[in-house]
Amino acid sequence: MRAFVLTGPGEFAVRDVPEPVAVPGEVVVDVERVGVCGTDLEFFTGDMAYLHQGHACYPMRLGHEWAGRVRAVGAGVDPGWVGRRVMGDTMLGCGSCRRCRRGQQHVCEKREEVGIRGGRAGALAERLAVPAGSLHALPDSVDPELGALVEPGGNALRAARATGAGPGDRVLVLGPGTIGLLVALFVRAAGAEVHLMGATEDSLAFARSLGFPHAWREDTLPDLPFDAVVDATNAVHLPALAQESVEPGGRLVYIGLAAEPSLIDTRALVLKDVTAVGILSASPGLDATIKAYAEKAVDPRPLVAATVALDAIGAVLAGERPAGAGPGPKIHVDPRLM
């Protein structure tokens, strides 16, 4: 089968690789759609921390935001999965440690991460092998495009819920990229007023096109009381800005990761009586995200700018915009395209 293989920083090829096998406890999926993520870009540039911590190494196969149809099942797996449309959890815990037993496999010390950590091959390929226990069934109303948006959506839904926001609340989301916009969509669906802060006029214009009129640059951000602030950026200085912007008694949600340590004055957290929350992984939010998409409470499809073939991934990771791409921040891949 064909797969996108990253062999080093900026070095890649689409290769014929051995077909995955459905070993006991696992399934093989025909991949229909995959999202290209900021994590994939960090592996492409060589900046991803896992490369320097021994959790990942080249060559590797990327892709963790995926949807597809089960092709085959291994021993011990319900054959009823065959033919079903699914997406899968990225985080694969050991299943036996204290964290896994508590349902926190996404922070298991020994976890694998599909297309990211521990050598587990990712979904930028025609087919993918994953544990059956990681599967989440997709209803007919959630098509492949939506299915590949469940994983980032799960992260965003958890961040939105962590704000505790509802009608009458005002929430500031820093960063109108894929995650920030998804957070904004879920917060709006909860009934709160949403403000977004971004760095470029294009990103802010796109946010406004989605029905978010309160879209600002850092130098135009109004002095308003924000009941919660979500930092969905990788900017080192913005965690502190989030802390400054939130109302006393409010909530800070950190879902972005900067390349360098950020500085937060914990005295301000205490004196403002602020609750700060970190969000890692979509795992606990996947089912609720599928439900939200199926019920059309949130429609993230405008975020997808283009869908390309495997052969175009390298150019996308190198920063090229596909011909005819829309204004959204997300690029999808359909491995069936030639």
Explain the meaning of each model-derived region.
Residues 1, 240, 283-338:
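C-terminal hydrophobic helical "lid"/dimerization subdomain
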Residues 20-34, 49-98, 139-141:
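Glycine-rich beta-strand-centered segment in the early N-terminal region that forms part
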Residues 35, 74, 91, 233-234, ...:
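Short glycine-/small-residue-rich Rossmann-like dinucleotide-binding loops
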Residues 64, 94-174:
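NAD(P)H dinucleotide-binding glycine-rich loop of Rossmann-like/cofactor-binding domains
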Residues 81, 142-218:
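Mid-domain Rossmann-like dinucleotide-binding core that forms the NAD(H)/NADP(H) cofactor-binding site
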Residues 163, 170, 195, 201, ...:
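Glycine-rich cofactor phosphate-binding loops and adjacent beta1-alpha1 units
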Residues 255-259, 279-282, 308:
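Short strand-turn motif at the edge of the Rossmann-like AdoMet-binding core
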